[in-house]
Amino acid sequence: MRLRVVAVGRDRSGLYAPAIEEYAKRLGRYVKFELVEVPEARKHAGTAQARDEEAEALLAKLGPRERVIALDERGAEWTSVAFAERVRRWTEGGRDVALVIGGSDGLSRAVLDRAEETLALSRMTLAHRLARLVLVEQLYRAMTILRGEPYHK
């Protein structure tokens, strides 16, 4: 079973990269974790065209039987404990899970339709790289909650 974050864009600034790498390393103690990045659409593309280009790249990275969770501002919000329970349910039976983060124009209808659930990290808009960090930290927190470890207090 793999747990993956599939996201549009790369952290060019390097601002969040060290923290993301640290939480990814910690997650590796509990589950096979992978961060997959696809390129952002060309800037000259219109919003719909950009979303479609990014959708094509995102969908190509998803396995046919992989459980897909899309991050979307209209998605469900959970507490960390409720999120941990959701992660437990998603990973039951050894099925691969991919949490998908779109680009600055969001996710296309095709990606949202492929998703089994949608998740909102916050009702506030987060920078995409910050959302990636928050998600990876919450995945790590979920693993520690599920194992009764003291990280989550």
Swiss-Prot record:
SUPFAM superfamilies: alpha/beta knot
EC assignment: 2.1.1.177
Location in or out of the cell: Cytoplasm
Reactions mediated catalytically: pseudouridine(1915) in 23S rRNA + S-adenosyl-L-methionine = N(3)-methylpseudouridine(1915) in 23S rRNA + S-adenosyl-L-homocysteine + H(+)
Listed GO CC annotations: cytoplasm
Residues the record lists as binding S-adenosyl-L-methionine: 71, 102, 121-126
Matching InterPro entries: Alpha/beta_knot_MTases, RlmH-like, tRNA_m1G_MTases_N
The entry's keywords: Cytoplasm, Methyltransferase, rRNA processing, S-adenosyl-L-methionine, Transferase
Pfam family, one: SPOUT_MTase
CDD domains assigned to the protein according to its UniProt record, in alphabetical order: RlmH-like (cd18081)
NCBIfam families listed in its UniProt record: PRK00103.1-4 (NF000986)
Function text: Specifically methylates the pseudouridine at position 1915 (m3Psi1915) in 23S rRNA.
Subunit-structure text: Homodimer.
Name this polypeptide is given: Ribosomal RNA large subunit methyltransferase H
Organism: Anaeromyxobacter sp. (strain Fw109-5)
Gene name tied to this protein: rlmH
